[in-house]
C-alpha cells in the first residue's frame, strides 16, 4: 500500500515545520509486482563502502561527498548508469539509501543496553520518561542527523568551485517507509534542495522496519504482533524493489519508470536486508547514514 505526500520546503531562514503526515496506509498486503527481479550491486563500485580496505564502522554517518571514491565524479556515475540502460541486459538505477535519524527507541536502547532492550523494554511503549511505541518520533539528535545530510547536499550542489559533473544528481523519485521517523528524516534531508516547491514522497509499506515484537515497529496500538524472519524481510524487500524497478503499468504507482536516480528513506533492518539481497558489502549503518548504490535489476526467471 502506498500514499503520496508532499513536503514543501520553507524559506531558508525558517526552522523546519512540524511534521504533519498526510493520509497513511495501514498495515496490509502490498500489490504484487508485475515482474519479480533479481538485484545486484554494480561492481566495481563507485563508492568507498564496497572497498575492502574501508573500515565502514569508523565512517561517520554522513561521509564527505556521500562516499564517492576519489578520482571519480558524479557525472561518471550518471553517464555509466545511462550507458548501461541503453545497452540493455538489465535496469540500472543510482539509489541513495538512507537510515532514519536517531529515534526515541534508539535512545531507549542506548539507555538500557541492547540485551535489556531486546528482552524487556522493546516490548513496552515507554518507561514513564520516554515514549517509543508505537511509531516513535525522532529525537533532537535524530533531527540534527537528518539536517546534517541536508547540509551535505547543499554543500555539494551549491559549491561555486564545482563543475556540473562534480555535483551529485538529485533523486528523481523519493520513497519512504510509512514510519514517522523515516518520513521526517526524508523531509529534513531534502528540505530546500529542490527549491520552493519541495518534492513528493511516496510511502511504501514494504519499506517498513522488520516486523516483530518491538512496539517501536508497530504502526498503531492495534498492529498485530507477528514475527518476520530475516529471509522473509529480504523477500518482502525484493518484491518492493521489483515494484519500484518495474515499468509503469497504470495499476501500481510505485514504479520509477524513467527515473534513473531515486532515494529511499528506511531503517537499519531494511538496509541490511538490501545488502544481503544485492551482494553489497554488509555492515550496520549508523542512524542518519546515507549510502549510495548502483543497482542492477534483471527478471528473476533469467538468473
Label each PLM-derived region with a short phrase.
Residues 219-225:
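Short, intrinsically disordered, charge-balanced linker/junction segments flanking boundaries
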Residues 253, 257, 265-267, 273-275, ...:
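C-terminal transmembrane module of eukaryotic multi-pass membrane proteins
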Residues 93-95, 172, 255-266:
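Generic beta-sheet signal
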Residues 208-218:
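Short alpha-helix plus adjacent loop in nuclease-associated cores
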Residues 101-104, 179-182, 208-209, 268-271, ...:
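Short, solvent-exposed loop/turn segments at secondary-structure junctions
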Amino acid at each position: 500500500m502506498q500514499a503520496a505526500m508532499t513536503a514543501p520546503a520553507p524559506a531558508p531562514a525558517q526552522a523546519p515545520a512540524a511534521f504533519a503526515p498526510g493520509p497513511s496506509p495501514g498495515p496490509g498486503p502490498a500489490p504484487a509486482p508485475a515482474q519479480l527481479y533479481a538485484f545486484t550491486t554494480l561492481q566495481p563500485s563507485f563508492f568507498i563502502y564496497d572497498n575492502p580496505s574501508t573500515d565502514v564502522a569508523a565512517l561517520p554517518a554522513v561521509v564527505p561527498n556521500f562516499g564517492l571514491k576519489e578520482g571519480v565524479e558524479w557525472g561518471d556515475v550518471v553517464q555509466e548508469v545511462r550507458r548501461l540502460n541503453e545497452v540493455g541486459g538489465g535496469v540500472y538505477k543510482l539509489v541513495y539509501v538512507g537510515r532514519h535519524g536517531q529515534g526515541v527507541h534508539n535512545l531507549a536502547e542506548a539507555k538500557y543496553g541492547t540485551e535489556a532492550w531486546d528482552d524487556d523494554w522493546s516490548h513496552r511503549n515507554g518507561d514513564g520518561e520516554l515514549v517509543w511505541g508505537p511509531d516513535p518520533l525522532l529525537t533532537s539528535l535524530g533531527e540534527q542527523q537528518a539536517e546534517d545530510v541536508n547540509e551535505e547536499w547543499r554543500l555539494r550542489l551549491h559549491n561555486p568551485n564545482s563543475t556540473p559533473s562534480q555535483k551529485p544528481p538529485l533523486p528523481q523519485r523519493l520513497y519512504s517507509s510509512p514510519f514517522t521517523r523515516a518520513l521526517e528524516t526524508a523531509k529534513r534531508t531534502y528540505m530546500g534542495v529542490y527549491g520552493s516547491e519541495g518534492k513528493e514522497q511516496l510511502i511504501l509499506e514494504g519499506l517498513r522496519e522488520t516486523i516483530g515484537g518491538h512496539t517501536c515497529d508497530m504502526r498503531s496500538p492495534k498492529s498485530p504482533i507477528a514475527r518476520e524472519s530475516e529471509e522473509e524481510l529480504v523477500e518482502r524487500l525484493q518484491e518492493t524493489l521489483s515494484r519500484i524497478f518495474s515499468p509503469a503499468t497504470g495499476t501500481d504507482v510505485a514504479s520509477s519508470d524513467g527515473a534513473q536516480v531515486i532515494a529511499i528513506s528506511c531503517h537499519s533492518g531494511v538496509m541490511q536486508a538490501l545488502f544481503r539481497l544485492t551482494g553489497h558489502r554488509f555492515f550496520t549503518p549508523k542512524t542518519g547514514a546515507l549510502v549510495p548504490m548502483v543497482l542492477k535489476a534483471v527478471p528473476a526467471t533469467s538468473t
